[in-house]
Amino acid sequence: MPRYDDRYGNTRLYVGRLSSRTRTRDLERLFSRYGRVRDVDMKRDYAFVEFSDPRDADDARYYLDGRDFDGSRITVEASRGAPRGSRDNGSRGPPPGSGRCFNCGVDGHWARDCTAGDWKNKCYRCGERGHIERNCKNSPSPKKARQGGSYSRSPVKSRSPRRRRSPSRSRSYSRGRSYSRSRSPVRREKSVEDRSRSPKAMERSVSPKGRDQSLSPDRKVIDASPKRGSDYDGSPKENGNGRNSASPIVGGGESPVGLNGQDRSPIDDEAELSRPSPKGSESP
């Protein structure tokens, strides 16, 4: 089975990725090895070579595609479009001018099928190399494009402030928690002070010695009260009514204490009055 198909009789080849040093005569010398070359159309970095026999063209494409020539690896493919000025268009692709490539500027194929040079690094808007359409100076800037579409996004902007309030709520909540945590030790100190002021704590803090001192005056009053039927009072201390029984009277008054230092109680006086005197018994 032959490696070529001459159904369309394609004798025109596309040669791409040529070096800047390559000339027309260099291409004629290279392709003339495989057959008779009819025409060589040289461009900036690509060229079109036309053979007299389609089989010679297919042989040249088979052996020269991907070969290093003049310091560059060239690509050789069958041209899909008819050359300019050709009257016999037939059914081989679109008419001249209708299928122009944005990459190489040649009619007969599309940019996605072009293999002339580094076609991926060429701008489809201005046709220059070294940048793409997105970075082209002639293309509209993204800022203007965003401004043009801002009218349709206006409802979204009106909703955006509501969404921005949510972080502030979370911040206030976090602040409140941190504030309450910082105040918690003060509350604990207050609770300790209240416990220390409670009556139970005060009773626990009082020593047994203090209890005896606080209860000693009552016991002294009870011990100092004169007992019934006793003639003597041990010491000039307070009785049950809180009065001194042997306090001296200022102003030369007589003391109720007798000559012998005995303390006369009212009960003893009543007993003496009730007794009969010996003189009365002796009287007639």
From Swiss-Prot:
GO cellular component term, pick one: spliceosomal complex
Principal location class: nucleus
Keywords from the named record: Metal-binding, mRNA processing, mRNA splicing, Nucleus, Phosphoprotein, Repeat, Spliceosome, Zinc, Zinc-finger
Residues with the Phosphoserine modification: S166, S168, S184, S205, S207, S214, S216, S225, S235, S255, S265, S277, S281
Keyword Repeat found: yes
Biased composition (Basic residues): 159-180
Region of interest (Disordered), residue spans: 74-97, 132-284
GO biological process, one term: mRNA splicing, via spliceosome
Changes after translation: Extensively phosphorylated on serine residues in the RS domain.
Subcellular location: Nucleus
One GO molecular-function entry: zinc ion binding
Domain RRM: 11-81
Any Pfam family matching the protein: zf-CCHC
Compositionally biased spans, kind Basic and acidic residues: 186-203, 209-236
Start-end of CCHC-type zinc fingers: 99-116, 121-138
Family to which the UniProt record says this protein belongs: Belongs to the splicing factor SR family. RS2Z subfamily.
PANTHER family associated with the record: RIBONUCLEOPROTEIN RB97D
Subunit relationships: Component of the spliceosome.
Function statement: Probably involved in intron recognition and spliceosome assembly.
Anything else known: The splicing pattern of the pre-mRNA is regulated in a tissue-specific manner and by development, and changes in response to various types of abiotic stresses.
Full protein name: Serine/arginine-rich splicing factor RS2Z32
Organism, scientific name: Arabidopsis thaliana (Mouse-ear cress)
